Amino acid sequence: RWYEVTGVQTCALPISMPLPCDIKFERDVPVKLRDGITIYTDVFRPIDDHSHPAILAMSPYGKEIGSQWLDDVPMRAGVPKKATSGLQKFEGPDPAYWVSHGYAIINPDVRGAYNSEGIILFFGSDYGRDGRDIVEWTAQQDWCNGKVGMSGNSWLAISQWFVAAEHPEHLTAIAPWEGLYDCYREVATRGGVMMPEFIKFLTESFASTESGGVEDCMATMLENPTMNVYWRDKIANLESIITPAYVVASYTNPIHTNGSIEGYRRISSKEKWLRIHNTSEWDDYYNSAHVEDLRKFFDHYLMGIDNDWKETAKVRLSVLNPGNKDIIDREEEDFPLQRTHYKRLFLNAADGSLNDEISKNDSNHGYDSDSSKRSVTYRTRMKEDTELTGYMKLHLWVQAPEHDDMDIEVKIEKLNCLGKKFLVSPMKAVSAKGYMRVSLRELDLERSTEQQPYQTMAHIQKLKDREIVPIDISIWPMGILFKKNEYLLLTISAYKSPPAESIP
């Protein structure tokens, strides 16, 4: 078995953080999965004869620099080069930090990635069982104390939902940092609107070889546009998860916001915590204060240290405030907030307003989806300082003359007291969005609530000529502050595909 000792104060990459300790680096360690497939993992661990807890970071990007890297992200998403050592896999924990605190880091090339046998899976129960195999292999190593955690953001966070749902005996704690859980409703489609661009961009970045390959999720999406056995297997069974969990979310992520928060709400773990931050997923994950916070969680569960982690508030909440100072880490008991007051606003097409009372006059609003003006807007001026935190929905009656379907996008934004948008970083677009393909409007009455409509996505109901139908559009969670006389802007538009590379 090949290994090397990476020495203290050396740098793995130019300008990177010097290593704080000596590290034993074992490369391409073979791991046999339950079906005979062999995958390969890198192991970083302390140089001693003691047993240590391990942290697993599971993804198909490559166990070293791989096919994606922070340098590929504009301005490294605010993560300075000196904040990391360069030993970490993309979106994974930095071995330099964790080994110096007594942990081993397990960075596998999952099934099909690089030299690992098989084809890369786009999540699902088999992917989760692969993770279970890796967890149990790790726990059996003589350098491991039998306790394994999981960490990482985005794909590495989604992996944790699927692996934890398979109940590996030695999986002791998870820390999913911004990860969706439903591959159909949150990445292949939104509200039934197909979004193949990101899946294509993502799968092309996987570290597959000619001898391997990637599950063709995009082709399956085009062949199977409605919910079926295939897509149900791509939904993590959150309710079956009982592992202690530290979940991190944000309002500004275009694919992970809903899944991260729903993951926290729906897992059955009795010991679980949620933190909603106000930056980007990478900036937050590698922020030194948050790394220390995560270590306190892992120290408690993986090392058995009797620290004060359990005194941490169950929910720590950020509330965004464009044009002013955000609220950060406000302590709460739950999400959505128990003191939430839900309010209805009625659309008035005559003047484009949102009002407390329904208009006495009938009106309608329309747009041409093929023209440059493919949207309509409504606004309301805040009569007092207001916090909008939690879930929203939009109820509409719609028709599509001479067409049998519609793809709708809705967006909630804050405007200043002059009715102008705030200037914010492209990495921090402050808006809450929802989508709907009208032919997939059928509600799941068992899952839907007054605040959160939930579609079955199982039956296509095409529109008849000039038929008017009601639809309920779920708008993903948001936390935002309005000062008196600032505006809430609602935009309803025909959906237009974004550039794939703009979706993290």
Language-model segments: which ranges?
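Intrinsically disordered, low-complexity Ser/Thr/Gly-rich stretches
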Residues: 347-504
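Active-site-proximal cap/loop segments of hydrolase catalytic domains
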Residues: 12-310, 314
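Acidic/polar loop patches that form or flank catalytic/metal-binding clefts of enzymes
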Residues: 145, 173, 274, 303-318, ...
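Catalytic cores of secreted or luminal carbohydrate-active enzymes
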Residues: 293-310, 319-374
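Residue-level signal for short segments within beta-strands and strand-turn junctions
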Residues: 33, 45, 319-321, 412-416, ...
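Single conserved hydrophobic/aromatic residue that forms the stacking wall/gate
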Residues: 1-11
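Short, surface-exposed loop/turn motifs at beta-strand boundaries within globular domains
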Residues: 22-24, 34, 240, 338, ...
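Generic recognition of flexible, low-complexity loop/linker segments
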Residues: 17-18, 28-29, 93-94, 233-237, ...
